[in-house]
A protein has these predicted regions:
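Short, flexible loop segments at boundaries between secondary-structure elements
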Residues: 120-133
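Thiamine diphosphate
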Residues: 1-122
């Protein structure tokens, strides 16, 4: 994010965010003005079996604020997420968006077998298809 003029989206799970809290402190310190950090909070380490995380006790937006993020939002519905995404051009960056979501994943979810570019394309296709519903 520091060496790019492009907007950078960091997509994180709650379990990963909890394990790497130092990253939030670094982001808050450096303040990259093109970074949007999204934490999908399903209160589980879903990709490795669904064990519960300690995120019910965690408030990621408050953590991000205390680390120096100028903008934070927490959403629980698609309508709230749509509003935040619409407001995004007016937010100071870096921004953190915590998305509360239910546990549940694709039946074929496994360990990564494709590269980041292919993952991005599949995510964008699925997101686009879900938004059309």
């Amino acid at each position: 994010a520091m060496h790019s003029s492009r907007r950078i989206w960091c997509l994180d799970g709650d379990g990963a965010a909890l394990m790497h809290l130092g990253a939030m402190a670094t982001i808050g310190h450096v303040k990259p003005d093109n970074l949007i950090h999204v934490i999908f909070n399903n209160q589980a380490h879903e990709s490795v079996g669904g064990m519960p995380t300690t995120s019910p006790a965690a408030r990621f937006a408050l953590m991000a604020q205390s680390c120096g993020y100028p903008s934070t939002r927490t959403v629980s519905t698609m309508e709230e997420l749509d509003r935040v995404l619409s407001d995004l051009p007016g937010l100071m960056l870096p921004a953190l968006i915590e998305v509360h979501t239910a546990v549940g994943s694709r039946e074929d979810l496994g360990r990564p077998s494709i590269g980041p570019v292919e993952n991005k394309t599949a995510f964008m296709d699925r997101w686009s298809n879900n938004r059309k519903r």
